[in-house]
Structure formats: C-alpha cells, structure tokens
C-alpha cells in the first residue's frame, strides 16, 4: 500500500502543527512522516520492513491508526508525537537489545518533554 491509498487515518492539521511548534520551541528535533500500521506486534519480516520503507513509510506502529480512525469517526481532534525507540530499517538501537544506561535515561527524559509539549499544544488548540 502506498501512503494516501485506502482509509486515511490522518491527524488534525491544526493540532499536529501546534505540537510541531511546541516541540520546535523546546528544541526537540522531530520529523513528520507517514507511519505504517500493523495489527501484530513484532511481526514484520525483513521483506515487509523493506517494502513499507521503499513505499515511503518511516515507521511502524499498532495503535495510532486505530485511535485516529475512531477519533475521526466521532469528529475528535487527533495527533500523535511518537518517540522512535529503534530503527527497523537500519537495525540500529534495536529494542530487542534493550535500552541501557544513558540511552534509557535520555528516552525517559525525552518522553516527559514530549508529553509536556503535547499537553501544551492540546490546551492551546481549539
């Protein structure tokens, strides 16, 4: 599937833009890309990963698309700020190896910073 085909479980642009602005204001690097949704945790073979990467998807996630689809159905605002824990394409920082020491602390701190940015963005966006 190519991004944009099928059912589009997209973010509310105003909320997504507000989150991006909050992240930028805090100096938190971010990227905005399409995410591939899968119904099975850790079920992607190397071939599946290569295929979705080749088609422009920049990550994989289980929950976001379902949450967005339900929110969209009910007319609710929706956006996500996902933290990349590992890179399935280049296989760097594999979650299978676990997070250790400084990397674990960094991820915990970054998670907290992103959460505050999202809360602030949601509070300021109608």
Enumerate the predicted regions with their spans.
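Glycine-rich phosphate- or other oxyanion-binding loops that anchor nucleotides, phosphorylated ligands
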Residues: 1-126
């Amino acid at each position: 599937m190519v991004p944009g085909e099928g059912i589009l479980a997209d973010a509310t642009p105003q909320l997504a833009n507000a989150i991006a602005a909050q992240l930028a204001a805090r100096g938190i690097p971010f990227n905005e890309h399409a995410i591939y949704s899968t119904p099975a945790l850790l079920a992607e073979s190397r071939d599946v990963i290569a295929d979705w990467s080749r088609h422009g998807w920049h990550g994989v996630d289980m929950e976001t698309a379902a949450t967005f689809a339900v929110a969209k159905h009910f007319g609710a605002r929706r956006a996500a700020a996902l933290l990349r824990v590992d890179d399935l394409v280049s296989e760097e920082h594999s979650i299978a190896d676990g997070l250790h020491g400084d990397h674990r602390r960094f991820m915990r701190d970054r998670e907290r910073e992103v959460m505050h940015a999202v809360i602030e963005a949601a509070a300021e966006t109608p």
